[in-house]
């Protein structure tokens, strides 16, 4: 079979195999201003880029105001974090400071408390790919809430509507 190209309604080409009617999957582009940041109310602003509801994976960009501390949580799956700006660390590991350009891998089962130093010059900007859920813990280590792909998408859509008048932001959603 040979590759041919046809036009999609958007005018962008999509590749097809000759003799088939099914198109190859195409890449989905989201520019930084396609999805709004929402104020989560605790010194964080979230931009949910992608969720795979079947696999339980959520991809987001988060900005943290100086002095922000996020509730202690345990991950049920692996997390990848890439710091774009600013600096942050886990209270449990104060010497391991994430700065612009740093990559962090968190294995499933890791427990920590994210903290952004109050003396940061501006917001800290981090890109996360999270597999599974965050089990949010109280001071005794008991689970008080769960954050996962489903809840992140639901809350993000709600906050987009409340804060920006956008009820259906163009989050890339798989596995729905």
Language model: regions and residue ranges:
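Short acidic-glycine-tyrosine-enriched beta hairpin
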Residues: 53, 80, 89-111
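Conserved catalytic motifs of the protein kinase core domain
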Residues: 57, 79, 123
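Conserved short histidine dyad/triad with adjacent acidic residue
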Residues: 41-48, 56-74, 107-111
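Ligand-binding loop in jelly-roll beta-barrel domains
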Residues: 95-100, 108-139
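Short, conserved beta-strand element in jelly-roll/cupin
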Residues: 63-65, 74-90, 129-131
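A generic structural signal for short coil/turn motifs at secondary-structure boundaries
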Residues: 70-73, 91-92, 115
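"Short basic amphipathic alpha-helical interaction patches in structured regions
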Residues: 63, 75-77, 95-103, 142-144
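A short, N-terminal "cap"/entry segment at the start of jelly-roll beta-barrel domains
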Residues: 1-56, 142-176
